[in-house]
Amino acid sequence: MKVLEGLKYSKEHEWVKVLEDNKVSVGITDFAQDELGDIVFVNLPAVGQEIKVGETLASLESVKSASDVYSPVSGKVVEVNEKLKNSPEIINDDPYGEGWIAVIELSDVSVLDTLMSAEEYKQFIGE
């Protein structure tokens, strides 16, 4: 499983990349996409939606199952990855790059301190 340095990770297998201007991008980890199998549908959040840690950010459907993506941060959704609507398999192909799900403007940056480092996440998934 690929785990990228420089990202933060949640116990629900989401990753967080810190951007500029108090914003972060969020997606699911390589571990999560591998567990789900081939993703065939993505239900994205609405731009402008206020979200809190632990709330459902998006829903994914794969050939094996359906799964919610829980927000690892609190804030306002300012951008979503529209490409996923027509090509949800991008998440399988490139979960840390083109497969990002949303950009969130943080309401509280201290939540980043509660997330795991790459090393901690590797231990969490038993790598």
Curated annotation (Swiss-Prot):
N6-lipoyllysine modification, residue list: 64
Swiss-Prot/TrEMBL GO biological process terms: glycine decarboxylation via glycine cleavage system
Domain Lipoyl-binding: 23-105
Pfam families assigned: GCV_H (PF01597)
Cofactor(s) the protein needs: (R)-lipoate
SUPFAM superfamilies linked to this entry: Single hybrid motif
Keywords: Lipoyl
Family matches, as Gene3D superfamilies: 2.40.50.100
UniProt protein name: Glycine cleavage system H protein
Lineage: Bacteria, Pseudomonadati, Coprothermobacterota, Coprothermobacteria, Coprothermobacterales
